[in-house]
Amino acid sequence: ILNGLVWGKEWCIVVRMNGAKVILECLKKEGIDTIFGYPGGAVIPLYDALYDYSDDFKHIRTSHEQGLVHAADGYARSTNTVGVCFTTSGPGATNAITGIATAFMDSSPMVVISGQVPTSLLGKDSFQEIDITGATLSMTKHNYLVRNTKELVPTIKEAFRVANSGRKGPVLVDVPKDLFLAEMDFSGEDYDLCQIDDYMDYKSDFDLDDETNIKLLNEAIDIIKESKKPVIYAGGGVKSSDSEEILEKFATKIDTPVLNTLMGLGNIDRKNELSLGMVGMHGSREDRKSVV
């Protein structure tokens, strides 16, 4: 329903829609095209809305909530994007906990949108009510319980910034069922102009042209040159920053072998003569001895 035109920097169309469609519009703005999910009572309005967005999203339904979160996690790792998944309240949300914990431990960016009982029933031990924000507090970078429609757009935007900045990880957004159904005005400008804290858009302030940094880099190069048996120990940050090729070129240039953490597997071709494999409890005896 076209609700009117609003003047900002330019005229923009304002549309009246329910909270479920607003969430999907926000996901479109984030460039999301794949969603993992499993339907349930609290997220039925979200799935009703998803039907109208079948051309915008590929929805993959798993047979269990734990599977959908692991799938979203795997998708995030393989595509280097944010994985997105839907789960219902109560048992649906608790079933997702193992997958959320895995993504947290492995620094995998993910946004989990869970359904919740209506706001009027919160805290009343309602059917399939669980304090999922409390339950996942120790295994998410941040989590949110959306209390009203005004919080919906900024919460979704902030969730993606938190998940995909600094050390990446999962974020949970818990949305009561009545907010999926509540009508509100929305335009693309709402999302674009939504203000979030500066620290959410983390960017390294490392400047290669800075004299101090150049000095530090030269000192590091000298230390490497003087080393008798240097080893590069590479982790998951290499993959998440798309730096595998740079790592391989660097290792080749200084003729130094590369050891990987568990999350760093795949940083360098295993057939490369400089690839030693992995250290730690899952590594080989030879790999472990290389750092002793």
Locations of the language-model features?
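N-terminal alpha/beta PP-like core and its mobile active-site loop of ThDP/TPP-dependent enzymes
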Residues: 13-292
